[in-house]
A protein has these predicted regions:
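Structural preference for solvent-exposed beta-strand-turn elements
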Residues: 1-372
């Protein structure tokens, strides 16, 4: 087996795939990249058994074969080369030789048949989404997904496809984000829960792509295909909670405020909040929004005023500043609308501007009880 490949091209693809590999694998073979050579195409794969990702690299070759090589050793070596052609050639018993302008390097390899086979999806359903829209949907929702192993369904993002719209939802029971697109639709209705790890991998590479992503899925797995990349992952098993039921419908108190100013105030004031609750207090009256926090243990206190447009009864409500900051940071609008009803009911954040036609973002944050 012998091939010649550009060092920078190979490194670029391997760095993308390297995110799949866990630092502590139960199967030693999973510490490797799988190389499958078929004349002028080299297919490189990485897997953690739950997620398998592969990409195709153009090479010069007249041979074929499959081997598994150490991911860490190969990545560390490739990072040190300036862009140049490298020759990979299998030598004798389980050794592959890499030749560069600078010298020669020998690495051990395993037989490719030891590497776990990628899952095939028999008769899957299929939906096609522009890469930039899927990338945005993941970015807007993934931060709100939970980390609770006892509630695995809430540790992923819920994909809801229909002939009217595509909806993506994430929640950890303290905050919730619902992102919808009516300008992209599916042929048939489908629902599944995607784990966070493959979504983070996709998020990192979809941003730079202007192609379309083909999503194939069944009850157990999903497959994403775009450009020269294929990602197959196991879905989270279980039923997603009825998120619509927790979004309050009647919210008479409406606060409109400059998003960047509000975000900066929340960040500043939260420095003085309790390190356990991160609680900040919002006090609305007329055209004034008062943001305050207090840490009684250390006698720290902060108080800021912002001008705003507020319609409704004067009220005070407490929020976790970390959740509020995350949400405000994730919106692109100049102004944000916060709708509330009572101090013990959730607040709803929506952007006033900056969304595409057919794009809708709803963010919900649960209040914290104010200690007077």
């Amino acid at each position: 087996m012998k091939f010649i490949v550009s060092s920078s091209q190979l490194l670029k693809q391997l760095q993308v795939l390297g995110g799949v590999i866990n630092s502590n694998n139960t199967l030693p073979i999973l510490d490797n990249f799988l190389f499958e050579l078929s004349e002028n195409e080299l297919k490189v794969s990485a897997s953690d058994l739950e997620t398998t990702m592969s990409s195709v690299v153009d090479v010069e070759s007249e041979s074929s074969g499959s081997i598994a090589v150490s991911a860490r050793l190969l990545l560390d070596t490739l990072k040190t080369f300036p862009n140049q052609p490298l020759t990979f050639k299998t030598e004798g018993e389980n050794t592959i030789e890499i030749s560069s302008d600078q010298g020669k390097y020998d690495m051990a390899y395993f037989g490719g048949d030891e590497f776990p086979k990628s899952v095939s999806l028999p008769s899957p359903s299929k939906t096609i989404i522009p890469a930039n829209i899927l990338g945005t949907a993941i970015s807007k929702t993934i931060f709100a997904a939970g980390n609770d192993d006892l509630r695995p369904v809430m540790s992923g993002v819920f994909f809801q496809f229909s002939s009217q719209s595509l909806t993506f939802v994430a929640t950890d029971a303290h905050k919730l984000v619902k992102y919808s697109r009516t300008d992209v639709t599916a042929d048939q209705t489908a629902e599944f829960i995607m784990p966070k790890k493959p979504l983070n991998l996709l998020k990192g590479i979809l941003g730079g792509s202007d192609s379309e992503v083909t999503i194939e899925y069944n009850d157990a797995n999903a497959k994403f295909t775009f450009d020269n990349i294929v990602l197959v992952c196991r879905l989270i098993d279980g039923k997603y909670p009825n998120y619509e039921a927790v979004i309050p419908k009647e919210n008479p108190n409406k606060l409109t405020v400059d998003r960047a100013s509000f975000l900066n105030s929340v960040r500043r004031v939260s420095i003085f909040s309790s390190k356990t609750t991160h609680q900040i207090r919002l006090k609305m009256a007329g055209t004034e929004l008062n943001i305050s926090a207090e840490d009684l243990d250390f006698s720290n206190k902060a108080d800021e005023r912002l001008s705003c447009d507020y319609q409704g009864d004067d009220m005070q409500i407490g929020f976790n500043s970390r959740f509020l900051s995350e949400m405000l940071n994730n919106l692109n609008s100049n102004e944000v609308l916060i709708e509330m009803s009572l101090p013990n009911r959730a607040g709803i954040l929506t952007p006033i501007d900056g969304t595409d036609e057919g794009e809708q973002v709803t963010m919900l944050v649960m209040p914290v009880m104010l200690n007077n």
